[in-house]
Amino acid sequence: MEDMIRLLAAELGQKPQHVGAVVRLLDEGNTIPFIARYRKEQHGAMDDTTLRTLAERLQYLRNLDQRREEIRRSIAAQEKLTDELDAALQAAVTLSELEDLYRPYKPKRRTRATIARERGLAPLAEQLLGQARDLPDPLTLAAGFADPARGVETPEDALAGASDIVAETVSDDAAVRKALRSLMQRQSVLRTQAAKGKEEETSVYQLYYDFRQPVPRLQGHQILAVNRGEREGFLKVTLETDREQALICVRRCVLVPGGGAAAFLRAACEDAYDRLIAPSMERELRAALTEQANEGAIRNFALNLRPLLMQPPVRGHVTMGLDPGYSHGCKVAVVDPTGKVLDTAVVYPTFSKAKRAEAIETLRRLMDRYEVTHIALGNGTASRETEAMVCELLRQKHGAAYMIVSEAGASVYSASPLAAEEFPQYDVNLRSAVSIARRLQDPLAELVKIDPKAIGVGQYQHDVPEKQLDEALSGVVEDCVNAVGVDLNTASPSLLRRVAGLNATTAKNIVAYREEHGAFTARRQVLKVPKLGQRAYEQAAGFLRVPESPQVLDHTGVHPESYAAAETLLGLCGYRLADVGALTELPARLEAYGPARAAEACGIGLPTMRDIVRELCKPGRDPRDELPQPALRTDVQELKDLKPGMVLTGTVRNVIDFGVFVDIGVHQDGLVHISQVCNKFIKHPSEAVSVGDVVRVAVLEVDEKRKRISLTMRGVPKDGETGPDCQKTAR
């Protein structure tokens, strides 16, 4: 375990004692959000992303150790485990290294080498591989192994069988495979061509009909696109490796300078490479590239999901949600500032001029009746026509504004059992309009009801391993929910189940308890909820807010275990609990007293004390409120209105490997290629922007026919500055 901790510490750039503390906390059953927030002193204040990376690597290394022991036992059972081999197994740090070492001892199907061994030719192969300087001519040596009774008719047959054994031995050699793996990763080229019969067919894979790229320069999105094109029968894919360079690698590992049987062994090495090594290592390299691409796609999805969930809520407004459509009309829902449905309707603005006028009048009446100030417009089918109608309406209704809201996943949610349980009285289509309205009011509370994969901010999410994607995205959702905290008396089961220590069952039990007994008036009261024990309470308590509690600390993110410390801290600075919420001088008084001295007096560490001070100064703080508010609109442009050089403000909708998609209000997102994101080289656009960022862009090119907009952020003035400098700001 100590070796594992040192390795993790080196990989993550953390101190071994901090990594060891995290391992212990995880093994004790603590959740990542709890460790990140309330055990900072023990792990050096790692953030939740680092902690999740650590947990994943820890699991990988433990699985590696388990596989190492399985291999050791298997080889030992064959009585072939030498001290040298055991040391090599212990030194292996990747699964491929372990499997390479195990390969010669792994049970195999019946091969040409197996048959040759059955015919008694293993000693001949061993002599030839021994390469003694005084070794007789191979054919002369093979004459002694000819045995018609065993199927070896001639010396040539014996030599051929020995060659099969040597080829398999070379193929199974860990050093050979390691050298070739390194060569192929550095020098191989991926080539794709149109599959037979597809050469003239138009498809999304045309870019890859004649494509060559060195392996080190392959991008994740290219690998996943090629894999999909091959799977769908559009592409033929090959890996090209310099055969002579590969054979040099093999011979260096096998041949002894000046040794006997050199010509025979050279031929056997060629056979080993062509027949056994190259096909298997090409498959291995393709698999490794796919794994890397999958990890990148999952990482990209998680990077995009976090800022989407953490978009600032638009609180305190009656909001109208519009789910556009053609044949089924535009679905309308009006919700109050708490998200409660006030009214619904269906209008048909695309049917005729008369229906459009009727739709505008219906929306105007609803806005007047309920004093609607904000409109959330879904970005799906018929959104362009609906947006034009909304703009015409807003020219009559001054003071109101609208925002385009991604409706990704809304239809999935509206048809789900959860939506049916929440809105049994409403049609499926109307539920999606409610969801769209609520997404503007509180994106996090609404988006947690939807499978993260359906939110649509990734690339190739349907091609990556579902289990890995689910785990990564669930972690992001959990981190976001706990970073914000939840109101114990208003949170839905969907939100509560994401709180550290809770699950779907305890979340439903909390809601059932408050429906039966009324609002919670203290955090500890949650311990009365069935199936919610002390351990779950410890993990969850700090993330649950109870504004109705007479204990003011229940309104904050201060953990109950630190209540005494918080009161002591207030006393040291001349305050009482009753002063919480009006502590503008607390930081200055603490500085005058001495932070280290105060932390010692309170029996806590400095990181915990800083968190407590932040909560006391702003009880019930929501980190999302500190981020830029979403951009609201009152008018719209058309694609034909765009001209090269125009400078616009837009909202980042998606960040992928090759660029950034930006909504600039023309029904078609524009693309900022990675080379146009900022004034210096970046490896990934996420280094500069995140989903939800409001950015300034300039139009480079407009292709109306293909509905493509090329944008740039380079040298575009923003807020009086000279242009983006690639320094990503906190959102």
Question: Where are these predicted regions, by residue range?
Answer:
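Generic start-of-chain signal for non-secretory N-termini
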Residues: 1-20, 27
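Long, highly charged, low-complexity intrinsically disordered interaction regions
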Residues: 4, 56, 62-80, 90, ...
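A glycine-rich phosphate-binding loop feature that marks nucleotide/adenosyl-phosphate handling sites
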Residues: 182-189, 322-326, 380-385, 405-412, ...
